[in-house]
UniProtKB/Swiss-Prot annotation:
GO terms for molecular function: ATP binding; lysine-tRNA ligase activity; magnesium ion binding; tRNA binding. It catalyses: tRNA(Lys) + L-lysine + ATP = L-lysyl-tRNA(Lys) + AMP + diphosphate. SUPFAM superfamilies: Class II aaRS and biotin synthetases (SSF55681), Nucleic acid-binding proteins (SSF50249). Its main location: cytoplasm. Its cofactor is Mg(2+). Mg(2+) 1 binds at E411, E418. Its EC number is 6.1.1.6. This is Lysine--tRNA ligase. It comes from Aliivibrio salmonicida (strain LFI1238) (Vibrio salmonicida (strain LFI1238)). Binds 3 Mg(2+) ions per subunit. InterPro entries: Aa-tRNA-synt_II, aa-tRNA-synth_II, aa-tRNA-synth_II/BPL/LPL, Lys-tRNA-ligase_II, Lys-tRNA-ligase_II_N, Lys-tRNA-synth_II_C, NA-bd_OB-fold, NA-bd_OB_tRNA. It comes from the Bacteria.
Amino acid sequence: MTDQVQLDENKLIAERRGKLDHIRQACKANGHPNDFRRDSLAADLQSEFGEKTKEELEELNHIVAIAGRVMAKRGPFLLIQEVSGKIQAYASKDVQKELKEKYQGLDIGDIIGVKGALHKSGKGDLYVNMEEFVLLTKALRPLPEKFHGLTDQEMRYRQRYVDLIVNEDSRTAFIIRSKVVSAIRNFMVDKGFMEVETPMMHVIPGGASARPFVTHHNALDVDMYLRVAPELYLKRLVVGGFERVFEINRNFRNEGLSPRHNPEFTMMEFYMAYADYNDLMDLTEAMLSQVAISVLGSDKMPYGEYTVDFGGKYARLSMLDAIKMYNPEHAEIQALTYDGVQDRDLMVSIAKSVHVEVESFWTCGQLLEEIFGETAEPKLMQPTFITEYPADISPLARRNDNNAFITDRFEFFIGGREVANGFSELNDAQDQDERFKAQVSAKESGDDEAMFYDADYITALEHGLPPTAGQGIGIDRLVMLFTNTHTIRDVILFPSMRPQA
């Protein structure tokens, strides 16, 4: 914002404060009345009366009470915006005179209540004839388009309230988000899942490979961690006999910001006993198709230059096969087998050849995943399940019966990014104990995203976890697809931001 723009804005703010002082003195009140009640929304009026003729409305003389924010002034008409949409109000010359005397006129951004008969203009637009009116809230700051428009992306996120006022696309995105969450919840309940809530603060962080946020509980005098995932608590509930559970809630990971990452994000995580990861993939196909149709009216939606198709069966590829598919000219990759994947020197060589910066503590499985992420993941635009994840990067997943190097795990990709992660759960307490210990060793070697050892979870497994499959779905990333947006900040109301200087 230039110095001149700032001066102009400060001048307008001072003028509006002066108007509010005038209102307070004239009304002998605080200038913020709270006794107006609206009885109609713009969308409902359009639905009920939009097809009626001008003459029919005049004959009806239907009186309505509306309220909202003044977004434009066009001669005697005010454009009023509220949660359902916009509608015009007509101010006669007498009303305009009264507005001037009582409020020194209305400004863009003011919130008003209006009562009067519903009419239709010559152009066919509904409007309310202002017979009674009240200024409910004086807007002291002008809306941004008065000066330069809300074009600063950072300002959109820092002042989301302003973004929502002036940007219809933003409002629509968050309405879609709400509908997506509701549709998922309804789907899960219909499938016999029970919604639960598990702790947000953990004594031992677990359930995902991620760096946690640390806090301190004063009364207990103990460090605690904001949860990185609810997984271990949800599986404790399955041990306890709740065979189908789900939770939609926040996770926290003390990691960087990117178009795909926010330290605080929403996950839907669920577990079902007597099922495996194949059942999860089938359930995911049914869920996303139903949610898309429920929210958007179609199981096909635009995403960038693509059309994402949520209908039917989705592609299923092993991680190794996906790497081979998207590296057809790379001889070493084309010749790679699972025996070769376990040759660390070979994997380091291949990783470097595809421009992966290798960390010294990475395992063979991590190297395979990084090669996949560099060469294949960005190309998975249509819904795709990637399977056969190595055991050394899947510490909570069940080993494959035919190949102990891999697990019965998948990650689900759309639009070139991971949206979900699921697997047949490891319910062998002894194997889980050994994998936790391997994670502790990895942490000691410098991997700060490796998991902690959770002795109580081992105790829970020793009581017996039935054959179980579980999955987490990133709500924010899923909503990015439904809203055709390409940064996670556009679908989180108040994303994390660096402090302003």
